């Protein structure tokens, strides 16, 4: 495994707004940078990758690091603007590589070019010769079919490699092609031995991610796919009315039943079982969220007496069992005598002149000092005195 520090140059000029590479050049370039970054970091755990932009004033977004998340977060903040400045970008990338921490790392620059180059071929060739002396390899990904770009870039790569060198590469991606697929089969990913991109293809691991190397990313992708599947199933259930037969089911008549094989029967049984479990789950959720509205009275239409009676009934239902057993143990004579005592108490209260006087004072529109009220209260006092005299004579 080769120890290598790599600077990736991101073309973010206004030409990256074009949609000739679906959905836009900028987005497919991000996919290609993701692929290159993961390839370099997985080939050796000590490798480092940096990121910089090429438009207008060249900017270094991330210095050399082994944290792929940092590269991805910086890359997604890039917006297209201005024109590409390829020559300045390559010089600054070389300066960043010269200040790498691992001096035993080989130096490599990966440049994405999707804009017309405004530099002369001679200037780029001179820069290529300087990079060759410093033992810096450059890989260029050219896309967009801009005039003489390929001729200028080919001369640049040939000056880097010399007669026998093969360390630098040029990959041209024509319109209509997928940039990441072209990179997968290129020497930039595969390497000189053709084994650099092992494990990055979508057919090797699920979602194109090795769970042994990045278990968190693999788990996140798996959970995301499961949530998407559940969301699609719920949308299909909402689209189909309740009780409607599934498409292509029993609507085919008897011929469809006779022609179905064991596999179809097993799939139909599995679907019925899933539907049954789903129905039971929905029923349980409905029961758990259901409120007993039918058992609750309408307090708005109840009188005060009805509300008091309902409150007393609820308090009796909430009372402990001991009070119920104590009431059951009471003799029947007490129950028979209780209403009489209540009646006697009520008669005594009604016949109390002081109580009547207080009630009359609180009644609206009643003058307790009027002659009629005084006569009524006085008659009650006379009746009370007569009753008390009669009781005293009976006792004697």
UniProtKB/Swiss-Prot annotation:
InterPro entries: PSMD4 (IPR027040), PSMD4_RAZUL-like (IPR049590), UIM_dom (IPR003903), VWF_A (IPR002035), vWFA_dom_sf (IPR036465). The keyword Repeat applies. Residues 1-188 form the VWFA domain. Coiled coil: none annotated. One of its GO terms (biological process) is mitotic sister chromatid segregation. Residues 212-231, 276-295, 303-322 form the UIM domain. Keywords: Proteasome, Repeat. Residues 249-262 have a biased composition (Gly residues). One of its GO terms (cellular component) is proteasome regulatory particle. SMART domains: UIM, VWA. Gene3D superfamilies: 6.10.250.380, 6.10.300.40, von Willebrand factor, type A domain. GO terms for molecular function: polyubiquitin modification-dependent protein binding; ubiquitin conjugating enzyme binding; zinc ion binding. Belongs to the proteasome subunit S5A family. Binds and presumably selects ubiquitin-conjugates for destruction. This is 26S proteasome non-ATPase regulatory subunit 4. It comes from Drosophila melanogaster (Fruit fly).
